[in-house]
Amino acid sequence: MLGASGVQIGTRFLVAEECDIPASYKERVIKASDIDAVVTGRSTGHPVRCLRNQLTRSLQKIEKEGGSEEEFNKLGVGALRRAAIEGDMQTGSVLAGQIAGMITKEQTTEEIIQELMLGVKEKLNLQVNGINA
């Protein structure tokens, strides 16, 4: 069977009831659209995917205009803390993957894992049925 050998699902678990981040962070992920996840930091060799906000627009402008790494880093210092601890959704680094636009509600970790396992079972059944056809 060909396909993925693993999954990376951090964004989904950010919105788990058990995740201890500010409600504003969870809300931002839930309200994200399919085009809100952007990458910054390519010019520094440290790309990061976050949800679009005032910080990402400023960082992207620096990169587009060929600003220095020092200028870039000055804006980024403490940005994750501002988002994940202080709940600042404008000048904080709201880390999230491309999947953010598909997350619509807060769930328990158990519910998330059950949904994932159901998806795996469905895919495996399709593979087995395809082989037996």
Regions from the PLM with identified roles:
Residues 1-133:
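Conserved active-site-proximal phosphate/metal-binding subdomains
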